[in-house]
Regions:
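Transmembrane alpha-helix boundary and packing residues in multipass membrane permease domains
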Residues: 22, 26, 38, 75, ...
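Transmembrane helical elements of multi-pass membrane transporters/channels
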Residues: 17-36, 138, 172, 201-205, ...
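Short runs within selected transmembrane alpha-helices of multi-pass transporters and secretion channels
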Residues: 70, 139-157, 165-173, 194-209, ...
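Short alpha-helical transmembrane segments in multi-pass integral membrane proteins
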Residues: 1-19, 77-142, 186-242, 298-365, ...
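Helix-terminus/linker motif at the lipid-water interface of multi-pass membrane proteins
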Residues: 27, 31-49, 119-126, 182-189, ...
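N-terminal transmembrane alpha-helices
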Residues: 6-43, 57-72, 76, 101-108, ...
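Interfacial/gating helices of multi-pass transporter permease domains
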Residues: 40-60, 126-131, 191-192, 233-240, ...
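Small-residue-rich hydrophobic transmembrane alpha-helices
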Residues: 49-109, 146-165, 272-336, 369-383, ...
Length: 448
């Protein structure tokens, strides 16, 4: 059995042991997304690439909400696992499955109907809007599949096993690349083929996780009673899931506003920011892994009523975040230009310079970004996910401010400082919020 109890042993060792498989999965996802981009660009041309790219922020808005909801649903499961309450854990799992199915059906219907108006609202250029629609409608029709994979993976992670979901993710990404080539080159399905490949391979990963859960975890063998609708349990799941989903979406709205502002500067700026953002996302993978780790660590230790360990875990993870920030700065300042050539041609001198300027301004602020992820996910894991939504709102506010006010005044330089501004805004809220949560949690544990 791969369950891992994070309430005992060295916090630093546990955090590293849990974060490394997550990091591998995140890096693999980035790698796969790069290969996907290369296939679409190479075989379908620049318009098809732009059509898929134009759906990026709205895709993150909706799919991010699904992922957030599933991660939130898993927090009460992690808490019951930490507390050793197996019966309660099973009732949460039963209600989690029912709620995920309901969310998936409702969201699919609403989003598929609103798909084209959303693209028009985002001022998607006329020459690519049909391609964008053909791509995103299939992705959105596959929302139930997104819920299946993210729900099962989040439940497995909440029991302390971060490795298994990553293995299935890697298999699914390899399958996705094969299906991309099949649908685009052999079946000539265009951008629709790329979308279909994504949905089918994610379905395979979800089914694998489901079978694994049923086979491997005795703790997850649900009796008839566990499947019964339980209003109290369902409410607790929604109280965790919906705020986490909203937090992803709120952050995405800020990015949509900023993207519109960048679009206004011109296509060279768009190309520079796209390349810079891709490298930044790749470099930030270890920070994302630290965040997800703290959600499970915080959940299990809060469930076990061990606040002292929560504080120790935060300290260990902050040290890791600081160390990694220095490594990232060194890598970007020494090899940033070479790394950007993964996404840009060497001949595009001016764009390359701008992209380099962008990534350097971002990486200097990786420690504030690390603190955003570590503290936000820890607060969520401890069961205070509504507070984390405010952090998302602070980020949205900062990106909106940059998009509406600073970019018109200072142009490209303002774009480069928009993310750092968002991270600092979020930290100004999150760090005091942690001490507030800590006091609340102490009071809750005292009164039982």
């Amino acid at each position: 059995i791969m369950e891992k109890d994070m309430t005992k042993g060295s916090p630093m060792r546990l955090i590293l042991g849990f974060a490394v498989p997550l990091l591998f999965g995140l890096l693999f996802q980035q790698l796969y997304s790069m290969v996907d981009t290369i296939i679409v660009g190479h075989y379908l041309g620049v318009d098809a690439l732009a059509a898929v790219g134009a759906t990026g922020s709205v895709n993150f808005l909706i799919i991010g909400f699904c992922m957030g909801v599933c991660n939130g649903f898993a927090i009460p499961i992690a808490q019951e696992f930490g507390a050793g309450h197996e019966n309660d854990l099973r009732i949460f799992v039963g209600n989690c499955v029912r709620l995920s199915a309901a969310f998936a059906v409702v969201m699919t219907i609403v989003v598929v109907l609103l798909c084209r108006p959303i693209l028009q609202l985002m001022r998607t250029p006329e020459n690519i809007i049909d391609g964008s629609y053909a791509y995103i409608i299939i992705i959105f029709a596959g929302i139930p599949v997104t819920y299946l994979y993210n729900m099962t993976a989040a439940i497995i992670r909440s029991l302390g096993d971060s490795r298994t979901p990553v293995i299935f993710l890697v298999l699914s990404a390899v399958l996705n690349i094969f299906l991309d080539l099949l649908c685009i080159i052999v079946l000539h399905m265009g951008v629709s083929g790329a979308a279909a490949a994504t949905v089918v391979s994610q379905a395979v990963a979800g089914i694998c996780c489901l079978i694994y859960m049923k086979k491997k975890y005795a703790i997850l063998k649900l009796a008839k009673n566990d499947w019964r609708w339980n209003r109290g349990y369902a409410l607790k799941l929604c109280n965790m899931g919906i705020p986490m989903g909203l937090q992803y979406s709120i952050t995405a709205i800020g990015s949509v506003v900023l993207q519109s502002a960048v679009n206004g500067i011109g296509s060279d700026a768009v190309a520079a920011v796209t390349a810079g953002s891709k490298l930044s996302m790749l470099m930030a993978c270890p920070i994302d892994a630290m965040g997800s780790t703290m959600a499970t660590y915080g959940g299990q230790n809060m469930g076990a009523g061990n606040l002292e360990r929560v504080g120790k875990g935060l300290k260990s993870c902050t040290i890791l975040g600081l160390l990694y920030s220095f490594i990232a700065i060194a890598v970007v300042f020494v090899a940033g230009r070479q790394l950007l050539l993964l996404f840009l041609e060497a001949g595009e001198g001016a764009i390359l310079e701008d992209a380099c300027y962008y990534i350097r301004r971002n990486v200097i602020f990786y420690f504030p970004l690390a603190m955003v992820n570590i503290v936000r996910f820890l607060i969520q894991g401890m069961g205070f996910s509504r507070l984390a939504v405010f952090a998302g709102a602070f980020e949205m506010l900062a990106r909106g401010l940059a998009g509406f006010v600073l970019v018109p005044l200072f142009g490209f330089t303002a774009v480069c400082f928009a993310n750092p501004l968002a991270w600092i805004f979020a930290d100004l809220f999150l760090i005091p919020a942690y001490f507030f949560v800590r006091k609340q949690a102490e009071r809750m544990l005292r009164t039982g």
